A protein has these predicted regions:
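S-adenosyl-L-methionine
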Residues: 2-178
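Conserved class I S-adenosyl-L-methionine
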Residues: 180-189
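Conserved SAM-binding loop of SAM-dependent methyltransferases across substrates and taxa
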Residues: 192-201
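Conserved SAM-binding motif I beta-strand of class I
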Residues: 204-209
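Conserved SAM-binding loop
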Residues: 218-219
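Conserved SAM-binding strand-loop segment of SAM-dependent methyltransferases
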Residues: 227-236
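A short SAM/SAH-binding and catalytic strip from SAM-dependent methyltransferases
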Residues: 245-258
Length: 310
């Protein structure tokens, strides 16, 4: 009589051997590429880490049912992942040190734009997904995120999502932010946009955010990086003093009557001086319907749209 358990066991072992062979070849390729540890290869490291997680994630190296060779391969993968993560951490700390020393205008912008083609800098991919530049900025800012259940919000306030870095860079380029500008982020959340604007331009930045816990985190970050050209205020955007702003940004932080009231306040500001309003997300449709504003390009909720006063 044929022992089916033996057949199943043998088939399982053969499958494991074949799988281990493929993973071994893949791992050898990564281990042989010493350039992965170079600071500017962040994007490639992040891809490699994702691939390692896909191939080896969830593996228990103490699993006695695995062969010794299989466990050794997975231990190598774990060690390589640790090495790549350490290279990322070293890069983040290096950029933080550059910013603290005041070298941010050149070094930081150069690093986050590395390996990005010129057309993607001018007109980045639409949508709200993230890429390696967001990983870099997140690693550099090291923002402390408050626990969501402790936050209270109005039904007209949209849950916080950070603006993808590629769109922030597009905003900076499209508005040509300079030393005479005051950039105001209405509903700034953890402060990603004002922080980045302060790092790579000479403009003053102001983040207005109703959630005090978010403001506290943004202030901590600005202080740790010694950024002096920005402020964060815990305040409802409807009650904020907007008199100093020249460029205003809305990443659909609220809708309904709140958005209507804020746009009315901005219209009053536009009677006193020329201003620009930049939008991203669903609120773009509402902003585009304001007759006192003119879009610089066809409004697109998936990209930054810049509006000038008419």
């Amino acid at each position: 009589m044929v022992d089916m358990s033996t057949i199943v066991s043998d088939a399982s072992q053969e499958g494991e051997i074949e799988c281990d062979h493929d993973l071994h070849a893949f791992l050898c390729g990564l281990e042989a590429d010493s350039s992965l540890l170079h600071p500017e290869r962040l994007r490639e490291r992040l891809i490699a880490l994702d691939d390692l997680d896909a191939g080896f994630g969830g593996f228990d190296s103490e699993d006695s049912t695995r062969s010794m060779d299989s466990r050794k391969i997975h231990e190598r993968a774990k060690a390589l992942g640790t090495q790549l993560e350490a290279a990322n951490a070293e890069l983040y700390q290096s950029v933080r040190a550059d910013i603290v020393r005041g070298a941010q205008l050149h070094t930081f912008l150069k690093r986050i734009q590395a390996s990005v083609t010129q057309d993607r800098l001018v007109r980045p991919l639409p949508g709200f997904g993230f890429d390696f530049r967001d990983e870099l900025v997140s690693g550099v800012l090291q923002l402390r995120e408050p626990s969501e259940p402790n936050l209270q919000r109005s039904p007209e306030m949209v849950p916080y999502q950070p603006t993808p870095v590629r769109h922030i860079l597009q905003l900076i380029a499209a508005t040509a932010l300079g030393a005479d500008d005051v950039f105001v982020d209405l509903g700034s959340g953890l402060g990603h946009v004002p922080l980045l604007v302060s790092m790579v331009t000479e403009a003053q930045s102001l983040g207005i955010e109703v959630q005090a816990a978010y403001v506290a985190s943004a202030r901590e970050c600005a202080q740790s990086l010694r950024l002096s050209r920005l402020r964060f205020i815990p305040q409802d955007a409807r009650e904020a003093d907007l008199s100093s702003g020249t460029v205003f940004y809305l990443y659909s932080p609220f809708n309904g009557s709140i958005l209507t009231d804020v746009l009315s306040a901005l219209r009053m500001e536009s009677t006193r001086r020329p201003i620009k309003i930049c939008s991203l997300g669903p609120c773009t449709r509402t902003v585009a319907s304001e007759t006192w504003l003119k879009a610089s390009a066809l409004p697109d909720m998936g990209r930054i749209t810049v509006f000038d006063t008419q």
